[in-house]
Amino acid sequence: MVQGTTSDAGKSTLVAGICRLLARQGVNVAPFKPQNMALNSAVTVDGGEIGRAQALQAAACYLVPHTDFNPILLKPSSDTGAQIIVQGKALTTLEASAFFGEKSKDYKAMALNAVLDSFERLGQQYHTIVVEGAGSPAEINLRAGDIANMGFAEAVDCPVIIIADIDKGGVFAHLVGTLALLSESEQARVKGFVINRFRGDISLLQSGIDWLEAYTQKPVLGVLPYLHDLHLDAEDALTDSPTKQAKSCFKVRVLVYPRTSNHTDVDPLRLHPDIDFDYVSLQTQALAQTPEIAADLLILPGSKNVRADLAFLREQGWDKQIAKHLRYGGKVLGICGGYQMLGERIADPLAIEDVFGTSQGLGYLPISTEFKAEKQLRCVAGELTLIGQTVAVKGYEIHCGESQYLTSSDAAKGAPLRLINELTCDEQAEKSFADGCLSEDGQVLGTYLHGLFDSPDACQLILRWAGLEDAQAIDINAIREQQLDRLADVLAEHLDLPQLQAILTASVKP
């Protein structure tokens, strides 16, 4: 099990790298994260929902995502509440006190049972399971009833490696302090450390490593270099330093609201060689010292709290910037929650996201959205038709809202996408359904389809629709595979593989 001294220490990346390293050696390996808190998620082969990082780790194992890889997923919908997803299915929305406070016993008992159930199933199918912890195991206020870190490791008798990020400073204090706050049995479970994101001459670090090993009696299993331009799906936070200027003057800007979700949708554009890409947030606008949003294509991504994020968008004056952008001939694309915002009306009569009520949309698409209790989760494939061309497209849908055209005449104009659900049986899969909406003037496009730009031909067609005539096709899946192999190569060079293998071998039950 890989645990970290802090969030963003490198746990997800190390697990993905170990998974790819083992899978390339022919080991029957799978990833596992007992409990994850993230806004980026993926649809699984069994019709559920897991954290995006576990979907990436599954790809590292050459596996399709399954709900057992991440049995508990917490998706924050406000500063104090989160949707609880258990083995792929949305269960309820709880306040923080319900799963971290004195009232948490019922939740934690249920969650632990689900976690152990999924882990046992994986143990029957795979020779090796590489487990990822969450945050830090030394959070004193979260240790009671813990199922994400040492609580899980103790329950299944799992060895632990602790990773720390040296790039932020204080790596020795982080490692020693984390170890000191663990119980004796938990300390004994820690088999070694990994130091992550090191820059410079490794010989200058050696005296610190020698001291750490002598003081803790634990080995340092490796020092991993800072990997520049490692393009892998981010678990939650936006990718560091996303701004990228290209030779082309074609500008793509993505709005960032407080509950932005599945921002990995735009990774193919962020990496596209012909695109000047950036996010638009409070921070970027403050740095630019201007409210202006200059772009050819403006994207409204998904949201875990659509009505609250729409209110935030208006508070920033971005609604006026969108209107100005369209007056000057720009294009706007809304994905999932962003699609709903572009419609006429958003209703939440059951308080699915936060509080019940109705919000007026931005009014660019003739649709009305209402949130339902049952979440739509499906992997889909089909066709996208724009500017007189039709191409293949593939992706997934995760949404509680159901959008309807306002009138039959709006519906008669046809949707830009025609899809089938890949998770259903052959007979049902033959029944295609429409998705999305294109404004009458052709400037505003909306869809529920996540992963839209992962299909090279669809990405190319949307860029042409937006005004980039000679747009190249970019294959994000091929890039992801290259980056996973690159990561595995780095681990093979910088980790003590014999020690790592000894830890794995000792943990395998007869």
From Swiss-Prot:
Q: Write out the pathway annotation from the protein's UniProt entry.
A: Cofactor biosynthesis; adenosylcobalamin biosynthesis
Q: Which residues form the GATase cobBQ-type domain?
A: 249-458
Domain of life, per lineage:
Bacteria
Keyword annotations of the record? Cobalamin biosynthesis, Glutamine amidotransferase
Q: Which GO terms describe its molecular function?
A: ABC-type vitamin B12 transporter activity; catalytic activity
Query: Where's the active site on this chain?
Result: C336 (nucleophile), H450
Q: PROSITE patterns annotated for this entry?
A: GATASE_COBBQ
**Role:** Catalyzes amidations at positions B, D, E, and G on adenosylcobyrinic A,C-diamide. NH(2) groups are provided by glutamine, and one molecule of ATP is hydrogenolyzed for each amidation.
The protein in question is named: Cobyric acid synthase
Q: Which organism is it from?
A: Shewanella oneidensis (strain ATCC 700550 / JCM 31522 / CIP 106686 / LMG 19005 / NCIMB 14063 / MR-1)
Primary gene name: cobQ
